[in-house]
Amino acid sequence: MKQLIIGLIKLYQYSIGLLIPPSCRFYPTCSNYMREALTKHGLIKGLWLGTRRILRCHPWNPGGYDPIP
């Protein structure tokens, strides 16, 4: 299941992600953060961390460097 989600993220990055201008306020980008969190922490915790990060990525958040814990 984890590999399926990582594959879907890669599909997004190499298809839709190339068609829209970059808008992520963080480094690494939210999609890279989710991939790394899933790889490092597994399915449940990785999804939790990635979802929290995506919810923080909005115009009222200053963004910046946000490494995976």
Curated annotation (Swiss-Prot):
<dbReference type="Pfam" id="PF01809">
    <property type="entry name" value="YidD"/>
</dbReference>
<dbReference type="GO" id="GO:0005886">
    <property type="term" value="C:plasma membrane"/>
</dbReference>
<keyword id="KW-0472">Membrane</keyword>
<comment type="function">
    <text>Could be involved in insertion of integral membrane proteins into the membrane.</text>
</comment>
<comment type="similarity">
    <text>Belongs to the UPF0161 family.</text>
</comment>
<protein>
    <recommendedName>
        <fullName>Putative membrane protein insertion efficiency factor</fullName>
    </recommendedName>
</protein>
<dbReference type="InterPro" id="IPR002696">
    <property type="entry name" value="Membr_insert_effic_factor_YidD"/>
</dbReference>
<keyword id="KW-1003">Cell membrane</keyword>
<keyword id="KW-0997">Cell inner membrane</keyword>
